[in-house]
Amino acid sequence: MYGIEYTTVLTFLISLVFVNYILKSVTRTMDFIIYRFLLVIVVLAPLIKAQNYGINLPITGSMDTPYMNSTTSETFLTSTLCLYYPNEAATEIADTKWTETLSQLFLTKGWPTGSVYFKGYADIASFSVEPQLYCDYNIVLMKYDGNLQLDMSELAGLILNEWLCNPMDIMLYYYQQTDEANKWISMGTSCTIKVCPLNTQTLGIGCSTTDINSFETVANAEKLAITDVVDGVNHKLDVTTSTCTIRNCKKLGPRENVAVIQVGGPNILDITADPTTAPQTERMMRINWKRWWQVFYTIVDYVNQIVQVMSKRSRSLDSAAFYYRV
């Protein structure tokens, strides 16, 4: 009997010693791993400069997240500037290194080399189809053309404001606009928009819902069309869907990281008369120079003043993001 008790006690003590040994081994192993990991971090820390730069993500729904550099406070050292210009500017300048020259000049104003991007576009119409405003600050140059005043105004209204948009299924539904901030925005290679207002019995007012030829044409073969109809009235629409996409959009407010500079013209285009523009100020300016070199020199000279009336990027705009948030 005593032999059995001694054996039990001995077994218990041996088990206790064994467990203690295992725990110490595990502890030593974990300490080794942790200390090695910390050593690697300490060694690599001086070689790594953490940055939290903005990432160009497609903005959808009502997401509104600012992406900012959080490690330094310099205004321009951590910012990017995009300068959009018509291709005719590069043609007139006829210098393969003209952008490098301007980059060096921007450097004198505090913009590091590589922070300024130059992006050409063919014409107002083509730029309207695929506006890509990815930088923290975006300056769009538009040369004045008396025949394109309305196109220029529509483009300015699009890029100087933010829009929350939803798809429209015009084959199944009628649509109405609720207020002055509610517009229908169409983009594509050729957008022809026709509308037929409806009464409470869904009968056409001055048109027949079964005859699209009786519809009123509000846009004809345009690349960008911002359509405004009578609020609170249902409409049946006809759209060239094979070459155009239409969205039901709500103006949210100004897009403060975009400025438009009009080159030439007797008067600057004024889109502030729109009652949905509040406050009645816009980031639109005018430069009256005949030669493009003078235009760019002026922009370099006053770039910091221009940027001061803007706010750093909070949203990106591209053709994919347009369909939900513009």
UniProtKB/Swiss-Prot annotation:
<feature type="disulfide bond">
    <location>
        <begin position="196"/>
        <end position="207"/>
    </location>
</feature>
<feature type="region of interest" description="CNP motif; interaction with ITGAV/ITGB3">
    <location>
        <begin position="165"/>
        <end position="167"/>
    </location>
</feature>
<dbReference type="InterPro" id="IPR042207">
    <property type="entry name" value="VP7_1"/>
</dbReference>
<feature type="binding site">
    <location>
        <position position="301"/>
    </location>
    <ligand>
        <name>Ca(2+) 2</name>
    </ligand>
</feature>
<feature type="binding site">
    <location>
        <position position="95"/>
    </location>
    <ligand>
        <name>Ca(2+) 1</name>
    </ligand>
</feature>
<keyword id="KW-1015">Disulfide bond</keyword>
<feature type="signal peptide">
    <location>
        <begin position="1"/>
        <end position="50"/>
    </location>
</feature>
<keyword id="KW-1038">Host endoplasmic reticulum</keyword>
<keyword id="KW-0479">Metal-binding</keyword>
<comment type="similarity">
    <text>Belongs to the rotavirus VP7 family.</text>
</comment>
<dbReference type="GO" id="GO:0046872">
    <property type="term" value="F:metal ion binding"/>
</dbReference>
<keyword id="KW-0325">Glycoprotein</keyword>
<dbReference type="InterPro" id="IPR001963">
    <property type="entry name" value="VP7"/>
</dbReference>
<feature type="disulfide bond">
    <location>
        <begin position="165"/>
        <end position="249"/>
    </location>
</feature>
<keyword id="KW-0732">Signal</keyword>
<feature type="binding site">
    <location>
        <position position="229"/>
    </location>
    <ligand>
        <name>Ca(2+) 2</name>
    </ligand>
</feature>
<dbReference type="GO" id="GO:0044166">
    <property type="term" value="C:host cell endoplasmic reticulum lumen"/>
</dbReference>
<keyword id="KW-0106">Calcium</keyword>
<feature type="binding site">
    <location>
        <position position="228"/>
    </location>
    <ligand>
        <name>Ca(2+) 2</name>
    </ligand>
</feature>
<keyword id="KW-0946">Virion</keyword>
<feature type="binding site">
    <location>
        <position position="214"/>
    </location>
    <ligand>
        <name>Ca(2+) 1</name>
    </ligand>
</feature>
<keyword id="KW-0945">Host-virus interaction</keyword>
<dbReference type="GO" id="GO:0039624">
    <property type="term" value="C:viral outer capsid"/>
</dbReference>
<comment type="function">
    <text>Calcium-binding protein that interacts with rotavirus cell receptors once the initial attachment by VP4 has been achieved. Rotavirus attachment and entry into the host cell probably involves multiple sequential contacts between the outer capsid proteins VP4 and VP7, and the cell receptors. Following entry into the host cell, low intracellular or intravesicular Ca(2+) concentration probably causes the calcium-stabilized VP7 trimers to dissociate from the virion. This step is probably necessary for the membrane-disrupting entry step and the release of VP4, which is locked onto the virion by VP7.</text>
</comment>
<feature type="region of interest" description="GPR motif; interaction with ITGAX/ITGB2">
    <location>
        <begin position="253"/>
        <end position="255"/>
    </location>
</feature>
<dbReference type="GO" id="GO:0039621">
    <property type="term" value="C:T=13 icosahedral viral capsid"/>
</dbReference>
<feature type="disulfide bond">
    <location>
        <begin position="82"/>
        <end position="135"/>
    </location>
</feature>
<feature type="binding site">
    <location>
        <position position="216"/>
    </location>
    <ligand>
        <name>Ca(2+) 1</name>
    </ligand>
</feature>
<protein>
    <recommendedName>
        <fullName>Outer capsid glycoprotein VP7</fullName>
    </recommendedName>
</protein>
<feature type="glycosylation site" description="N-linked (GlcNAc...) asparagine; by host">
    <location>
        <position position="69"/>
    </location>
</feature>
<dbReference type="Pfam" id="PF00434">
    <property type="entry name" value="VP7"/>
</dbReference>
<dbReference type="InterPro" id="IPR042210">
    <property type="entry name" value="VP7_2"/>
</dbReference>
<feature type="binding site">
    <location>
        <position position="206"/>
    </location>
    <ligand>
        <name>Ca(2+) 1</name>
    </ligand>
</feature>
<feature type="binding site">
    <location>
        <position position="231"/>
    </location>
    <ligand>
        <name>Ca(2+) 2</name>
    </ligand>
</feature>
<feature type="disulfide bond">
    <location>
        <begin position="191"/>
        <end position="244"/>
    </location>
</feature>
<keyword id="KW-0167">Capsid protein</keyword>
<comment type="subunit">
    <text>Homotrimer; disulfide-linked. 2 Ca(2+) ions bound at each subunit interface in the trimer hold the trimer together. Interacts with the intermediate capsid protein VP6. Interacts with the outer capsid protein VP5*.</text>
</comment>
<feature type="region of interest" description="LVD motif; interaction with ITGA4/ITGB1 heterodimer">
    <location>
        <begin position="237"/>
        <end position="239"/>
    </location>
</feature>
<feature type="binding site">
    <location>
        <position position="177"/>
    </location>
    <ligand>
        <name>Ca(2+) 2</name>
    </ligand>
</feature>
<keyword id="KW-1146">T=13 icosahedral capsid protein</keyword>
<keyword id="KW-1152">Outer capsid protein</keyword>
